[in-house]
Swiss-Prot record:
A biological process from GO: DNA repair
UniProt superkingdom: Bacteria
Keywords: Cytoplasm, DNA damage, DNA recombination, DNA repair, DNA-binding
Higher taxonomy: Bacteria, Bacillati, Bacillota, Bacilli, Bacillales
Name of the protein in its database record: Holliday junction branch migration complex subunit RuvA
Function recorded in the entry: The RuvA-RuvB-RuvC complex processes Holliday junction (HJ) DNA during genetic recombination and DNA repair, while the RuvA-RuvB complex plays an important role in the rescue of blocked DNA replication forks via replication fork reversal (RFR). RuvA specifically binds to HJ cruciform DNA, conferring on it an open structure. The RuvB hexamer acts as an ATP-dependent pump, pulling dsDNA into and through the RuvAB complex. HJ branch migration allows RuvC to scan DNA until it finds its consensus sequence, where it cleaves and resolves the cruciform DNA.
GO cellular component: cytoplasm; Holliday junction helicase complex; Holliday junction resolvase complex
Gene designation per UniProt: ruvA
NCBIfam families in UniProt: ruvA
GO molecular function annotations of the record: ATP binding; four-way junction DNA binding; four-way junction helicase activity
Location of the protein in the cell: Cytoplasm
Family in the record: Belongs to the RuvA family.
Record organism: Listeria innocua serovar 6a (strain ATCC BAA-680 / CLIP 11262)
Domain text: Has three domains with a flexible linker between the domains II and III and assumes an 'L' shape. Domain III is highly mobile and contacts RuvB.
Length: 201
């Protein structure tokens, strides 16, 4: 069983990405392959779920362990297969989904592909009350997003906000901000270039 893969994102298609490591390219199915577009040609860590059938072995990829956990929980629901589960979490924002499950909002759930009224009720029946850890983690993460630029210099704050606008996640930025802050009196452009160098190491 694979937990994650770390390698170069070589190819991005509408259905999957290819990550190369050890001179082997791994085809990984993801809910939104184009969310990896900014990482194309660079090293990325992708969390994995290996799905085995008699006629096929597939790797499904996720950008966080929370997404993967929710995917596995959805697979435990009768009537939900890997492609349906992946489509449900493709937005990358699991909080509204879990909120809908907890509040028994089957109308919200039927907005997802291949989820009818019966399947929506089954999701609620099987998963309500079992996803608290995931939603708590995501809420804490989102609350931290609001504080990411607190206490930074104007130039560094501008650089961080620009990097967010380019699609870099709060998780990625929080790893490099302490190192960026050690460099005093840089322009916003210089901070951006520094961040890009740090994130590709």
């Amino acid at each position: 069983m694979y937990d994650y893969i770390k390698g170069i994102v070589k190819t991005i298609t509408p259905e999957y990405i290819v990550v190369e490591t050890g001179q082997i390219g791994y085809q990984i199915i993801t809910g939104n392959p184009f969310s990896f577009q900014r990482l194309e040609g660079t090293e990325a860590q992708v969390f994995l779920y290996q799905h085995v059938r008699e006629d096929n072995i597939s790797l499904f990829g996720f950008q966080s362990t929370e997404e993967r956990y929710l995917f596995k929980k959805l697979l435990s629901v009768s009537g939900i297969g890997p492609k349906s589960a992946l489509a449900i979490i493709a937005s990358g924002d699991v909080v509204p989904l879990i909120t809908a499950i907890e509040s028994e909002d089957d109308v919200y759930l039927t907005k997802f592909p291949s989820v009818g009224k019966k399947t929506a009720r089954q999701i609620i029946l099987d998963l309500k009350g079992k996803l608290a850890d995931v939603v708590a983690s995501e809420i804490v993460y989102k609350a931290a997003e609001n504080d990411i630029v607190t206490g930074l210099s104007p130039q560094l704050e501008e650089a961080v906000l620009a990097l967010e606008a380019l699609g870099y996640s709060t998780r990625e930025l929080k790893k490099v901000i302490p190192k960026m802050a050690k460099e005093n009196d840089l322009t916003s452009d210089a901070y951006i270039k520094l961040a890009l160098r740090l994130m590709t190491k």
